[in-house]
Amino acid sequence: AGQYQLPCRKLLCSRACRPTLSVEDILRLGMTNCLEESPVQRWVIEAWRLFDNISMIKMMPWWVHFCCKFETLFKHGLVPLASQRMDLMFAMWFECDLQKTPRLTHTLQRVQKSLEADASAEMRSELLKTRHLVQCFKNIVRAPSKERRAGLATAFFKDHGPVRLPWNVDIVIVRMCVIKQLASSSNPLVMELHCKNGACHSVLLKREDVRTDRTAMGMGYWVNQLTSDVYVHTYDVFPLNDQCGIVQMIPQTKTLYEIRHSKESLLNYIMSSNETLSVKTLRDRVVASTAGACLLAFTMGLGDRHLENILVSSDAFLVHVDFGYVLGDDPKRQRTQMRITEDMIDAMGGHQSATFASFVRLTQLAYGSMRIHTSFWYHLLVSECFIVGDKSRHWKRIRDHTLDRFVPGEGHDEASVQIESVVEKATEETWFQTFVDMTHSASNQMTGIFRMEL
């Protein structure tokens, strides 16, 4: 009685307003301490029940973080939900493990036990085996020799048998082996994970914190969800702890460096790998993935964008990898907001082509869509401060970076002109950028010559 509805226009709602809570809404509520109120917590739990599993898994770091502040969200929300689905259970259990600190260890251990108690016996058994697998990965990272690493990989399956991957419970592996050690800064290990059906999944076991890479893949997922016609190629990232982690290797890819030095153009490489597809289809893929990669790099402030950190898949999609430098940081002190190489422009038909013009327009349209969700990109990035705990990435620095990138006070036309100028500047290949690409490659080659495999 006495209830009535007002349209969003009269309430001055944003264009992103919806009748139910979105992921973006929950982040805003959690960051402003509105979750202290019991009715708000109930609304959040109701929203969680409506979200798809992929979105829940992508946001699990934030959900666990908020639940640690308001533990009733664990008891009445996350634990009952996760205990019914194996993928959610694995994501939640390992995220609790990852967020343990001296202050939170007791709470999160209690939550893990509660989650296991509510789950079925089969799910508990599968989780236990996967926990042993994660420990095996950690032991392989610390192993002093390749013989020891091989022994650990072989012994695991003798003791435990087939096991589900912690980042994808639908994949069950029966064997794994360490193939080689790469000659890059952290000397990552290349591993092959073999399934019973004969499929093989290659991963990098990295001796460095990969939580920022996971943040990047989460942001890439949301770029795909909130824009039209652009595409960010994402891959699995699983932090083992704050010192090492696993990154999925994308099959059938080459770095732009490899293509450039094979005396083959990017367009020729793509066409020779897709003989049954038209040039237009291939160029559309290049345009969509280049726009997505550029917008992700622009949003995060990616640095260290040399030719070995940009890949192209055999089916014509460009992919950024290695997200160690963000918020404008760069080991060589470059101030490049996004990287567009001559090879990419050539694959689109040249700087004056209609395809390149459509790329610029697509980037502008997608950027306009992303500006509607400016606070969302801030909240995703600020996990570097509140969840990862990187003191160099203070929330005020991330706030200023986000405001600089999305200029929420400007009109649509002014912002569109700004992103167009950023794209145009990114297409200018400078002599310094060429020099950086050459020195990076030479450095890796020398590392490979002088590093001895132990």
Model-derived regions, located:
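Long, low-complexity, serine/proline/glycine-rich intrinsically disordered regulatory regions
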Residues: 1-19
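HEAT-repeat alpha-solenoid elements in large eukaryotic scaffold proteins
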Residues: 2-6, 34-41
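Alpha-helical adaptor scaffolds
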Residues: 13-21, 27-37, 45-49
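C-terminal catalytic region of ATP-dependent kinase domains
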Residues: 38-41, 45-146, 314-454
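Juxta-kinase regulatory segment immediately upstream of eukaryotic protein kinase catalytic domains
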Residues: 128-172
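Hydrophobic residue at the +6 position relative to the catalytic HRD Asp in the kinase catalytic loop
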Residues: 310-312
